[in-house]
Amino acid sequence: MPYNAPPQLAEMSLFDIAKALEERRLPPIEKCNPEEEIDSRMRIAAGGTWFHDGTPINRPAMVRAFSSLLLREESGRHVLLTPQCRQPIAVEDAAFMAVDMLEKDGALAFRLNTDELVLAGPDNPLRAEGDAETPAIYLAVRHGCEARINRSTWLQLVEAADFVDGVPSVTSQGATFPLVPQ
């Protein structure tokens, strides 16, 4: 089955983005509770590259498939989850990278390195880590996993920021998020 990448984020309306989010089909991993655990021998590097046995996974379709099975446990450990087994996966920073952003109609939409779209808001908050000089911004994606905002997307985010009580912040879907650690 051929993969049809979504259109460029800048070409999409908020309605188009909402429709794409509604139509996305992800495996129901929240229903899985396997007892068996095996080592995935996989890791996600800080830059978003996926590796298996030390070799980069160069097929975007494979990365998209694996990422749909990803969950972060309460302990902070990331696992690939199927009905048959749980497979720990080493994540150096965040499971995803946010590589583009669109501000439209009071919402911030992000495209991830997997081509997935995420709307920041109460269900997918942004959080700032690090310090005021070198903040790291993260976006909640799903199942406890996050996306780190890459540098070019961070610059887009800064352009969209306003000062709220003296703190650079952005608002999306009625929720306001500071861009510096609090």
Regions found by a protein language model. Give the residues of each.
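Long, non-globular segments of proteins
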Residues: 1-182
